[in-house]
């Protein structure tokens, strides 16, 4: 029987999730994968709120190493030792769950955003950018569909509410609630990664698009590397406890697993304002199953739990690579 409830500790890594509720003023057509639309609106509003030079190209800006927009949205421009080879943005979108793709006036819908490390200190700026983006209007097949951000919550903490506007976005960042950790699960025999959004796994320079190109072991290696990279880049003063002191120790655990996958090809179409065209993002979706003895699976559980929030693969800022754990 699937375990729907796990024992959760109060201790957490420096990662926080925010749930945003929107009330539409104009009809809005949500594309099947709305991450590109949401990310574009967010980036435009964040730049408007942050930029003081109004230069068209951030790479030429003398302040780009201090700019909050650059740190949040154009992280690859920040010159640090951790960015010498690769970089990741300190946020991931959590896409709307609505089955209907047309949101009518006065209807509400919701989505989320996860912030990592130092970006949590900028939560008020980030939520203000979302407020401005939604009020300005999301791209609706060439038109603007305006709305109102009526509520933002961080777990059980309400940060913004139209019912209490004077108290909105004034919570100190240290009071923002971080994600919980997870305790070991007794008699655990199987873990399933159920993907809520497509994932794009790059291996040997190519994106796996067909099931026969996919290796579940490489997915776990990718997740391990992503967690290490996010920890070092965005939260370097903390040690995210994932039960592994080094990569060799992690690989040794993988050899004890029985790995199965039930995945299929999928294509996500995104808009590129810079290139002024549609771009196809090929990837996979489905389930990945891990079976082993309880001790082995519990060694992996903290890492897999953390991956639910960080996502996996490429284009995580668009909300891709999000999965949900199913424990048995």
Residue ranges with predicted function:
Residues 1-328:
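RNA-interacting cores
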């Amino acid at each position: 029987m699937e375990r729907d409830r796990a024992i959760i500790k109060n201790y957490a890594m420096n990662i926080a999730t925010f749930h945003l509720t929107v009330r539409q003023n104009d009809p809005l057509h949500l594309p099947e994968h709305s991450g590109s639309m949401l990310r574009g609106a967010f980036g435009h509003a964040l730049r408007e709120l942050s930029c003081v030079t109004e230069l068209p190209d951030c790479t030429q800006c003398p302040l780009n190493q201090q700019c909050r927009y650059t740190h949040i949205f154009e992280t690859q421009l920040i010159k640090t030792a951790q960015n010498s080879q690769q970089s990741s943005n300190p946020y991931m979108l959590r896409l709307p769950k609505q089955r209907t793709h047309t949101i009518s006036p006065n209807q509400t819908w919701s989505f989320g955003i996860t912030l990592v490390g130092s970006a949590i200190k900028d939560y008020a700026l980030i939520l203000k950018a979302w407020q401005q983006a939604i009020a300005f209007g999301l791209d609706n097949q060439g038109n603007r569909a305006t709305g109102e951000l009526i509520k933002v919550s961080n777990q059980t903490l309400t940060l913004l509410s139209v019912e209490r506007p004077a108290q909105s976005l004034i919570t100190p960042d240290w009071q923002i609630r971080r994600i919980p950790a997870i305790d070991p699960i007794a008699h655990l025999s199987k873990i399933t990664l159920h993907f809520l959004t497509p994932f794009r796994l790059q291996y040997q320079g190519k994106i796996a698009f067909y099931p026969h190109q996919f290796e579940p072991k490489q997915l776990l290696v990718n997740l391990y590397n992503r967690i290490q990279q996010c920890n070092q880049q965005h939260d370097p003063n903390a040690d995210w406890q994932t039960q592994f002191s080094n990569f060799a120790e992690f690989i040794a655990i993988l050899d004890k697993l029985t790995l199965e996958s039930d995945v299929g090809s999928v294509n996500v179409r995104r808009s590129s304002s810079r290139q002024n065209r549609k771009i196809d993002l090929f990837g996979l979706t489905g389930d990945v199953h891990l079976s082993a003895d309880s001790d082995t699976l519990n060694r992996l559980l903290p890492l897999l739990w953390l991956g639910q929030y960080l996502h996996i693969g490429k284009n995580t800022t668009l909300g891709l690579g999000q999965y949900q754990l199913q424990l048995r």
